[in-house]
Amino acid sequence: GPENKALFSEAQQNEMWQLQTIIPAASRPPYNTHFNGYGLGWFLNDVKGYKQVSHTGGLEGNVTQVTLLPELQLGIIVLTNQQEGAAFTAITNTIKDSYLGIPAQDYVTLYHNRIKANVATADKVTEEVWTTVAKNKKDKVKTDWKSIIGTYKDNWFGTIELSEKKGKIYFQSKRSPQLAGEVFFYKSGNLVVKWNNAFFNADAHLFLENDASGKTIGIKMKPISDLTDFSYDFQDLDFKRVN
């Protein structure tokens, strides 16, 4: 601000930059990283012998990255108006490498080719799922939706409802209202949900836990695509029927 007041003290900064969670380190050129982990709100590692402090952020339509190399008195902030993390990584690494004396390389092409390959692999998986769903619909595969619809709760995420509207089944989160979409039969004990907001890129599996009578008493989730943003945390949810 105009008064140049510190947001936090040096002692608080040092505490934030202490490792709390260990993350495996990839010790390979050009950075030859020896340690990797998470502090209090910051990723911590070393690049070519220098401590690196960083974090990313994002909302729908933009992603950002902040990178600090204190020993070089270097700070890099990249703000974007798109959703591809490789963009800010390419910019950050290009600047960082110039300070570290690393020969320049074409990060844009490198990451473009890597993403293209990853997307092609992920697309095969998602296409198989939705092709199967379409075939099930065409073949009029019968599903006992009455035993599935109801209200379920995860202790962390809160309540969701599976309900029938005009012959279709819908998923609705109470706490996160945008997590809403139509539910389809995929395989025995396995439904899939297609979110109304396609920009999520996070359609998900619903795995059913049934009692002896065939009534669904629990639901677990998993993203269909391996490229789904990790922050959805579907794999950590464990819904139990409450109604």
Residue ranges, per PLM feature:
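Catalytic loop of the DD-peptidase/beta-lactamase superfamily, centered on the K-T-G motif
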Residues: G1-N243
